[in-house]
């Protein structure tokens, strides 16, 4: 079976590094210009690489120019959506998505799953169509979200699942045994792209949501943050505190700074047990208010 791979980022690189020794060398790899490890991988393994946005006929023209034909396209953490012209030119295209579709369509689904307090996520192999993560499901694997998991630790779990799921898809595609199940759109949810500025903590949230918000975006992600006198405080870990306070105390108030800062929220308080910019802790004083 002739295979082409669309992939981006660290997760994509780790997966293709794992599978290259177990499948025939792909006919081509498509990636983005920032995925330097994947570009280097293509060069080292003498695989033709398309670099950039595939839309507007660019990848179609690349395949035609290089007389590349494939039986199956595998998309792994690929940065771009495919347009109709490209999809129509492919015999079969399967994407691996980091959620249990139809829930959490869209970007960084594992991060959103933690933020929303889910106890499980997963990886779904689905047919690529012209919409975002809406194609028929061919395989699905559940992944538990433990209470101390972060966005990074969930990706570590995905790294182990993706290769085996890909091998299974390839084997069943070769034998024409892939079973397609339509997604139930009535159960679908969608979450968009996140930026570093989206990490602002709202101290009016309950402590459970604040903890989930922080761990979902912990290092090496840009991080959840708050503002102390306009200066950004990036928080990588919080734990619940049983410190007492008055009901009239404003949410976001620093209650104590003896060991770690303890911050008031509506249903209790949280202790900032890991802050990325440690020097800023010297500026914390009791009764100051984080924004």
Give the ranges of each region predicted by the language model.
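A short acidic-to-branched-hydrophobic micro-motif
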Residues: 229-242, 269-278
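A conserved acidic, glycine/proline-rich C-terminal tail/linker
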Residues: 239-261
């Amino acid at each position: 079976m002739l295979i082409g791979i669309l992939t981006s980022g660290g997760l994509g690189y780790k997966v293709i590094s794992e599978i290259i020794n177990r499948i025939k060398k792909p006919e081509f790899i498509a990636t983005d210009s920032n995925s330097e490890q994947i570009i280097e991988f293509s060069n080292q393994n003498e695989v033709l690489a398309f670099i950039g946005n595939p839309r507007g006929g660019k990848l179609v023209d690349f395949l035609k120019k290089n007389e590349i034909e494939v039986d199956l396209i595998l998309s792994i953490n690929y940065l771009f959506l495919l347009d109709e012209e490209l999809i129509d030119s492919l015999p079969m295209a399967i994407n691996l998505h980091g959620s249990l579709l139809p829930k959490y369509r869209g970007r960084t689904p594992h991060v959103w799953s933690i933020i929303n307090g889910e106890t499980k996520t997963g990886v779904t192999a689905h047919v690529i169509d012209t919409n975002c993560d809406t194609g028929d499901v061919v395989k699905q694997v559940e992944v538990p979200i433990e209470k101390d998991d972060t966005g990074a630790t969930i990706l570590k779990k995905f790294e182990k699942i993706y290769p085996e799921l890909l091998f299974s898809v390839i084997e069943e595609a070769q034998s024409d045994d892939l079973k397609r199940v339509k997604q139930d759109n009535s159960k679908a949810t969608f979450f968009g792209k996140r930026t570093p500025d989206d990490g602002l903590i709202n101290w009016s949230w309950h402590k459970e949501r604040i903890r989930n918000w922080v761990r979902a975006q912990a290092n090496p992600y840009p991080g959840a943050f708050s503002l102390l006198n306009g200066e950004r405080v990036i928080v990588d870990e919080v734990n619940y505190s049983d410190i007492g306070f008055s009901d009239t105390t404003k949410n976001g108030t620093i209650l104590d700074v003896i060991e770690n800062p303890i911050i008031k929220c509506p249903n209790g308080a949280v202790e900032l047990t890991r802050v990325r910019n440690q020097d800023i802790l010297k500026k914390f004083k009791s009764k100051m208010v984080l924004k």
